[in-house]
């Protein structure tokens, strides 16, 4: 349908169409025939509809006379480049009058003004999140800074040393019975197979407590497994001590006690961090195992004394490391829940030191 037919109304005078888009040429067109009013040239838009005027309008300032409409009509004055006019309307225009302006002062960058200050008690105040409930980590039984609390640390140390004292008491009693009671000493010497049974029980208990973290923290099963390990290892130590001279056993117990107390006190007082040497100690254990295999094939009293001396020195270093892990004031530390694991480490260190010292004394007296 052509542009002219879209504006035809039967028996009525029609106003001229609006001009086209700005920026393009304004072709002249002949006025409509028979029209009593002058027509303005226009350029059709791409969609067949008249565009919005921008720039000076060619129409008369008084608007289009529409018969019975008031002379004021709807003015179609020139539009400013910025958009719609904001000035006051003529008397015959809209009854609202001039549009109200924004209460904020004009801002050249178009940014709104800052919001007025709010009441601190309002939920939208800036300090609302600072006054909220504490975080989840503040309500834990063992927060991230639990080692800073001396009471927790001291309670953990007391529990570990209490368990260790009970273990050493059982072992010392077993060694005393196997050393001073002749009937028991004769029985264990004749039944060597009991040593291998106790060694198998000890090995299984050691693997369970060392590798199963959830199990060794589960009460009371952790204490049950630790008790089984203590009894089996005590039987092994007592059986080994029964093959040595009574004087050698007493000397080994005394030297072990002195060495352990000295190392523990030194580890508590020194500033040197032994926990940073764990990797070196693990490599040394591998070397010591290879040395032990060599001693099996090469039967030499001197070689066995050297092997026992290196083993005693190595587990003395392990005792220092485990003591500092217990104290928790170095690079590495144990959790307060690991009291069974801490007691196990200290106990095995002391027993190995005793066995190596007993080997040194026994081989030296031969």
UniProtKB/Swiss-Prot annotation:
Membrane topology: Multi-pass membrane protein
Protein name (database record): Protein lifeguard 1
Family from the record: Belongs to the BI1 family. LFG subfamily.
Pfam families, per database record: Bax1-I
One Gene Ontology molecular-function label: calcium channel activity
PANTHER family assigned to the protein according to its UniProt record, in alphabetical order: BAX INHIBITOR-RELATED (PTHR23291), PROTEIN LIFEGUARD 1 (PTHR23291:SF16)
Assigned keywords, A-Z: Membrane, Transmembrane, Transmembrane helix
Region (Disordered): 1-141
Source organism per UniProt: Bos taurus (Bovine)
Disulfide-bonded cysteines: none
Compartment(s) of residence: Membrane
Function: Potential apoptotic regulator.
Gene Ontology biological process: apoptotic signaling pathway; negative regulation of extrinsic apoptotic signaling pathway via death domain receptors; negative regulation of neuron apoptotic process
Record-annotated membrane-spanning stretches: 160-180, 192-212, 223-243, 248-268, 278-298, 302-322, 341-361
UniProt feature, compositional bias: Pro residues: 14-44, 67-109
A GO term from the CC aspect: membrane
